[in-house]
Amino acid sequence: MSLKKQIPIIFENTHYFIVNKPPGIPSQPPDCRTWGRTHPNLDPTPLLERFKAIYYSHREVELCRTVHRLDHCVTGGMLIAKTKDGSVKFSRFLQKGGNNGYKLQRKYVAIVESSGRFNKPNNYEIKYGPKYNFLISHGGREITKFKEVDENCIVLQLVTGKKHQIRNHVSQILNQPILNDKRHGSTVNFPELFNDQIALHSACIITKIGLQTKTHLIPMEHNNTGQLWSRKYVNEEGEFTLPIKEVLLENWDQ
C-alpha cells in the first residue's frame, strides 16, 4: 500500500482537507506512559504528524492543524484546517455553535449489538422527536442526536463533543454497545485484523464558510471485508447503502 493510501485525502479546498482516518491511529498525541502498555503493537505517532510526513511536498501542509478528534479505534472523516485562523474559526463553532466561526457538523454511523432494551440510569435521558432523537447525560452537558436506520444501525450527530461521548451514550443509554467495542461492553468476537477497530465511522462532515455549505460523505474503506461492517450496510467499495445515506444527508438543524 502506498503511503498516500494510508491516509487518503477525500476533499481539499482553500480552507481545509478532509481525510479518511484508518483504525489504530491516534488523532492526538497519546499519553506515552500508558500507550505502550495498553497498545503495545501500535505506533503512537498522531494522525497530523503522519499526514504531514506523507504529503510533505504539498506546499500547504506545514501549517495544518486538526480541529476535532476521533478515538484511535474509530475510522472515517477528519477535517484538517490549512491555517491557524481556519482552525480557530472551526474550533469557535464547536465551542459556541450558532453563527460563531466556521460551521462544522459531524455524523457517524454505528453498527451495534442487539440488546434491544433501553437503560434509564441516573443522569441519562432519551428524548424523542419527529425527525431524530436525543441522548442526554450529565444534566445536558453531553448531548448526541440519533436516528435508527434499523435495529442494529444507528446514525448519530454530536451536539457536544466530550471524550468517548458516542461510545458511552450508545452503550449506557441504548444498552447496545458498538460492535467490537470491548471497552464499552461488546461481547461479539472478530478476527485479529479488527483488534484496533470498532464499528463506528465518521461518515459525513458538513461545513459552512460564509454562504457556501459543503457536505462530504466518507466511505468505510478500512478492512472492508464484510465482517465488522456487513454488506447489508457497506458495499465492496466502502459506500454506505441508500437508507443510511438518506439519513446522513437529512437536515437535523430544523
Curated annotation (Swiss-Prot):
It is found in: Mitochondrion. GO terms for biological process: enzyme-directed rRNA pseudouridine synthesis; pseudouridine synthesis; rRNA modification. Its EC number is 5.4.99.43. It catalyses: uridine(2819) in 21S rRNA = pseudouridine(2819) in 21S rRNA. SUPFAM superfamilies: Pseudouridine synthase. One of its GO terms (cellular component) is mitochondrion. It is an enzyme of class 5 (isomerase). GO terms for molecular function: 21S rRNA pseudouridine(2819) synthase activity; pseudouridine synthase activity; pseudouridylate synthase activity; RNA binding. It comes from the Eukaryota. Belongs to the pseudouridine synthase RluA family. Pseudouridylate synthase responsible for the pseudouridine-2819 formation in mitochondrial 21S rRNA. May modulate the efficiency or the fidelity of the mitochondrial translation machinery. This is 21S rRNA pseudouridine(2819) synthase. It comes from Saccharomyces cerevisiae (strain ATCC 204508 / S288c). The gene is PUS5.
